[in-house]
């Protein structure tokens, strides 16, 4: 009887959110993102790729709404800004045909998943011809925590084959703000077009003095990002963002 009541509760909660449209979910996550007016944070990024090693990269990041970003680092290497600091609304604009997932295996009542078709132009991929463009159709599953209105997982795949999975882990920081404390990006790439794009992205983090000569079209690895020493909504001078 207890399990039946629990099942009915989960079903009712899921139906309540499903009665909303995807735009409602996106707006709620975007509103939550914009409640953070500014912050600074220390970030450590490590990359693990088979047969390749590199030291951890440390960054200090300053962010101020709506789109001011300043990244400081020692030595070579740049932190890709797209995706990490852009709003959910902007990130969702890289998807088309956004709808609710039909996957009914989830049991967390504070969770919902959206599915969208990835807009290839957002990847800056070199697609050789129109036929390749028509047959190359990645989809993206976005898992949203509907209690805190944050994105916890982004899974990119072609058919049922995973090519990239991002997981975000959150906690309360600086007394009262729910922010990511760790993110992981796992690659499972067998497609030459995507491997070249990912090689370029990883090379950017490492710095231009590093050459990503991975001989295979296969890129399989893990990028880990740890966040620490948050200072949230304490104000940041505009001069910080001047070059």
Where are these regions (language model features)?
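Short loop/turn positions at the edges of beta-strands in beta-sheet-rich folds
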Residues: 35, 63-65, 148
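An acidic-aromatic
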Residues: 48-117
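Gly/Pro-enriched, hydrophobic low-complexity segments
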Residues: 109-239
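N-terminal leader/targeting segments and the immediate start of mature chains
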Residues: 8-51, 102-105, 242
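Sec-dependent signal peptide recognition
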Residues: 1-8
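A residue-level signal for beta-strand positions that form part of recognition/binding surfaces
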Residues: 8, 38, 68, 111-113, ...
């Amino acid at each position: 009887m207890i399990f039946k009541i629990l099942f009915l509760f989960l079903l009712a909660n899921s139906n309540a959110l499903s009665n909303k449209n995807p735009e409602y979910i996106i707006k709620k996550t975007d509103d939550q993102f914009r409640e953070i007016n500014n912050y600074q944070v220390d970030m450590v990024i490590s990359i693990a790729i088979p047969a390749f090693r590199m030291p951890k990269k440390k960054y200090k990041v300053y962010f101020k709404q709506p789109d001011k970003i300043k990244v400081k680092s020692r030595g070579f290497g740049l932190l890709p800004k797209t995706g990490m600091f852009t709003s959910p609304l902007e990130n969702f604009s890289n998807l088309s045909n956004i709808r609710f997932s039909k996957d009914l295996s989830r049991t967390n009542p504070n969770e919902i998943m959206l599915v969208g078709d990835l807009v290839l132009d957002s990847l800056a991929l070199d697609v050789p011809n129109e036929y390749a463009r028509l047959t190359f159709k990645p989809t993206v599953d976005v898992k949203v925590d509907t209690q805190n209105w944050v994105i916890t997982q982004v899974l990119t795949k072609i058919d049922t084959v995973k090519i990239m999975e991002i997981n975000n882990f959150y906690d309360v920081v600086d007394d009262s703000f729910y922010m990511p404390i760790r993110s992981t990006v796992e690659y499972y790439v067998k497609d030459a077009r995507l491997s070249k794009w990912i090689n370029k992205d990883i090379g950017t983090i490492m710095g231009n003095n590093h050459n990503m000569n991975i001989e295979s079209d296969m890129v399989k690895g893990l990028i880990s990002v740890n966040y620490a020493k948050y200072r949230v909504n304490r104000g940041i001078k505009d001069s910080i963002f001047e070059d």
